[in-house]
């Protein structure tokens, strides 16, 4: 197992290098001139050229790439073109709000999604199944930005129960986490149901029932563990999606996180911040997939990695 983990970690190096090259080329292909945006609409050509020199944009593209890669290897992603603060500080100040929002969304989505999926599988083709799957399909189909605006209108504007802007208290997390986790809970419910339906028809489940084991114990002990392997895969992918895909939700709720920072950076063509954030998201997905693979062995001891 240790050899497998080390091998996967070493595989990060070429993957992140390829991502770095693609991201660098992508951000420099974006339309618009960062120097013009920073200098302002009233700036003349001389001022814009001076800003370009200060930002290093007057140098050849290969020279900019080498400077970017050599510094990134040392953990230095440069200065933000907009705030002139270190990119690492910009990301660090926004990371925790996004992480806590992701964890909050994932916790309730897993609890309610798995519960709905198990109920739908146990009472298959009956009203609990139909009700759960109808809600799940609705959750998948409803756009996150529309759900967010609907929740703001009802619970903040009309009722005045919950705040909409900021991340200072636990009340601020309720509406964004509901919005962000709705689609994940819906996918979790459908995935859990499909996995449980297959498990419930296995021979060992019928054997447990024949031995007089209660249906609740059969479902929770024998069914849940064996149905968890594909569900854990989906959980890992969804967690990475939440962590890196909260852009729309953060924009709707003006959340001080990485998603909003990325949107603002794209609008201002802040190349260093864009490159660092996409690299961070790529690293998160790779590490989450590694954790999921390791969890396989914990859930099912029959699985071993060589």
From Swiss-Prot:
GO biological process: transmembrane transport
Record topological domains on the Cytoplasmic side: 1-8, 124-134, 190-228, 299-306
Membrane topology, as annotated: Multi-pass membrane protein
ABC transmembrane type-1 domain sequence ranges: 95-292
Periplasmic topological intervals: 30-102, 156-168, 250-277
One CC-aspect GO term: plasma membrane
Keyword list, A-Z: Cell inner membrane, Cell membrane, Membrane, Transmembrane, Transmembrane helix, Transport
Signal sequence, start to end: none
Keyword Transmembrane: yes
InterPro entries on file: BPD_transp_1_N (IPR045621), MetI-like (IPR000515), MetI-like_sf (IPR035906)
Predominant subcellular localization, coarse grouping: membrane
PROSITE patterns documented for this protein: ABC_TM1
Aminoacyl-tRNA synthetase in keyword set: no
Membrane-spanning ranges: 9-29, 103-123, 135-155, 169-189, 229-249, 278-298
Protein's cellular compartments: Cell inner membrane
Pfam families to which the protein is assigned, alphabetical: BPD_transp_1 (PF00528), BPD_transp_1_N (PF19300)
Family the entry assigns: Belongs to the binding-protein-dependent transport system permease family.
Record text on subunit structure and interactions: The complex is composed of two ATP-binding proteins (GsiA), two transmembrane proteins (GsiC and GsiD) and a solute-binding protein (GsiB).
Primary role: Part of the ABC transporter complex GsiABCD involved in glutathione import. Probably responsible for the translocation of the substrate across the membrane.
Protein name from the UniProt record: Glutathione transport system permease protein GsiC
